[in-house]
């Protein structure tokens, strides 16, 4: 029986059943495991992950980013997805320039081509396809030219479901990247995983196209989870919020309160996993998610390969998306908001407080022969709830200026008394 059957708690946000350890635990939805019959495994270090995954797999790379932070998280869950995606990248020319160098990085190797003195879109695409074709094949992908002249584009498609590689242009002002991977059934896999193991809090995915991200975000929104995702589509940064149709804008438009997206052009960085690894060890609500340095993550700056202009930065801010950049000589995370605009530490603190109140009220009910429907009985519940509020003040999530409204037994409707339901108890925290 869930605790919500005993204590149904609703905490609303007035601005803009996990264990304590579970609130500090992330889950990576993976596909590279072999020989598993279970839907998840829990790890306490990268050594354990290395026993199950090759160092070339995205699961290992994401886990390594997660466990490399200080303070280090205590544990990580990797969930087994059975509905594997086919990874697809689409690369288009954003600016056709004569005698211009165009560069992409595939599986860690940079490939450069230079247009001639009478450059065309199609010429640049042909040069890029020829440059990366062999390396793409080695990585398990096919580099092909799509579209119709004079507006062709380059696609890189996994030769088998579950194939993964890193790929990005060094300058989104010249080349625009988009992941177009179809959603293979992310919600179905996650539903199966939580049946076996629901004691985790922060979801991470490895194939982050718009379709996959929106599916994962919708799933997390309906659960007591948060979803952190690194978005790499160039238009998240390069297109203004007012006219954008990219992933970050779609998440913002959907007003997701449980999804935090951060932009970095290189999907091999795993900035989402690194950020979760850095901040999940803190008591929920006691931390801020901006201004933090991440171990092993390359920051964006004014020049390639991880270029960030002030205009692009403002575009991301307008979409409530995060980013990782160099500021005053220090590499730090920026913004720390969920897609709907609330601070992610507020969401996390609220979730923990809700869970603790449910536990506290349930314990009063379960440890008492009977909680009488009198003012004295209501007082027992009030004392338990106030204890949770005081803990949240000590954690730094709430201020001590909160107010509590405690209903009297006489104010309750007879039908609620008969059903043993208490209505009207509430608290407000500035």
Language-model features: locations:
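Extracytoplasmic/secreted envelope proteins and their assembly/folding machinery
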Residues: 122-125, 129, 187-190, 213, ...
